[in-house]
């Protein structure tokens, strides 16, 4: 059986970052967006806005770097060792957040993709600040810190009203660079 090659996707914006437009008119990504091939989802997440509303503050970041994990056959994926208490979210339905702690101090967020039981996900590696974000956002741990994402959001439905991904209401032309995953 041929396996898909793991990749990191990073965007390089051809247009300058635009002022955040009011949230009216933006649509949450539907469940069907996530219930597709992981590499397709990873590519199409680039340029989307990740929104987390907490404590009366709406934080928004534009997704600019992602990494695809392709299920149990992908030895770099947490799911490669089978279903565990930690990884059970990856085996669940698409469109949910898989959030975990690394090195005992940094949270990382993945978006679960493909059908229930497939155990694939896309790691969000970096965002560009759009609204109410301060500090660095380049790297999975810094992204989560800036958006206030922690293990309390593990398993959270990304179609909820407080944590979701949207298509921005202004399309931008982007160029996508694919690179082999490191490590």
Model regions: which residues?
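Acidic, Ala/Val/Gly-enriched low-complexity intrinsically disordered segments
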Residues: 2, 19-21
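Conserved, well-structured core segments that form or line functional sites
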Residues: 23-183
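Short hydrophobic transmembrane-like helices used for membrane targeting/insertion
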Residues: 7-8, 26
């Amino acid at each position: 059986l041929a396996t898909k090659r793991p990749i990191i996707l990073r965007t390089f914006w051809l247009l300058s970052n635009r002022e955040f437009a009011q949230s009216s008119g933006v649509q949450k990504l539907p469940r069907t967006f996530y219930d597709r091939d992981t590499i397709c989802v990873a590519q199409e997440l680039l340029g989307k806005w990740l929104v987390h509303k907490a404590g009366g503050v709406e934080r928004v970041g534009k997704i600019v770097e992602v990494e695809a994990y392709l299920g149990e056959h992908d030895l770099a994926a947490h799911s490669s060792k089978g279903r565990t208490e930690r990884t059970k979210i990856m085996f669940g339905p698409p469109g949910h957040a898989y959030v975990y702690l690394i090195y005992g101090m940094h949270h990382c967020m993945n978006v679960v993709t493909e059908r229930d039981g497939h155990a694939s996900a896309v790691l969000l590696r970096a965002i560009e600040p759009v609204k109410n974000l301060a500090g660095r956002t380049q790297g999975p741990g810094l992204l989560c810190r800036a958006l206030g994402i922690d293990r309390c959001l593990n398993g959270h439905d990304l179609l909820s009203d407080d944590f979701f991904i949207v298509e921005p209401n202004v399309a931008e032309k982007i160029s996508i660079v694919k690179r082999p995953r490191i490590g």
